[in-house]
Amino acid sequence: MDTSMLIYPLLVFVIGFAAMIYMKTKGRNTKGNYVVAGRQYIKKFYPNLDVQQYEIVEGKITYSITAVHIPVLIAYNPSELYLFPVVRNMTGTKLNTPEGLEEHNEHIPVLSIQQIGITEKGDKMAFVVRGKETVINFSKRNSFNENQSEEVSNFLTTMAQAADN
């Protein structure tokens, strides 16, 4: 076997690894790209909606029996919230709908939320709407690897205030 044939798989591996590191560091140094991509994504489904009046944050929801956590785009304001299952594309610049979850977009008026529970660490929120419980897990970074701690804190504060009213 010719040893030069081993160079090609090794070269592909090195280029792929370098691209992965580049995307990770690119996300750490940016802020706001997820919000822009999220607003563009929402415009596809609701073209008449003024997306500028909504704040955007990312969480994870379990949609299946297999307990796979799917990233979900949360667009909210004090009176309503939208949940969109999303994944980022390979370049990390756009959001797409995961295959098989096209019908899981949800619009929830805040007044229809019957109960809200937030963990002390602020990494998980559960709420009940029409008898159906939804649990959202939050992480420090979103799919674009941007720090979203402040946005999560603002979201949980808004939901806690809505629960008090």
Task: Give, region by region, the residue ranges found by the protein language model.
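A short, polar/proline- and glycine-enriched secondary-structure boundary/capping micro-motif
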Residues: F45-Y54, G92-T97, N137
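Short, mixed charged/polar active-site loops
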Residues: P71, E103-N105, E133-V135
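Short amphipathic C-terminal alpha-helix that caps PH/PH-like domains
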Residues: E146-D164
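Anionic N-terminal interaction surfaces
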Residues: D2-S79, F84
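Canonical phosphoinositide-binding patch of PH/PH-like domains
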Residues: G131-E151
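An amphipathic alpha-helical interaction surface
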Residues: H107-V110, N137, D164-N165
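Phosphoinositide-binding peripheral membrane targeting modules
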Residues: T66, N77-M125
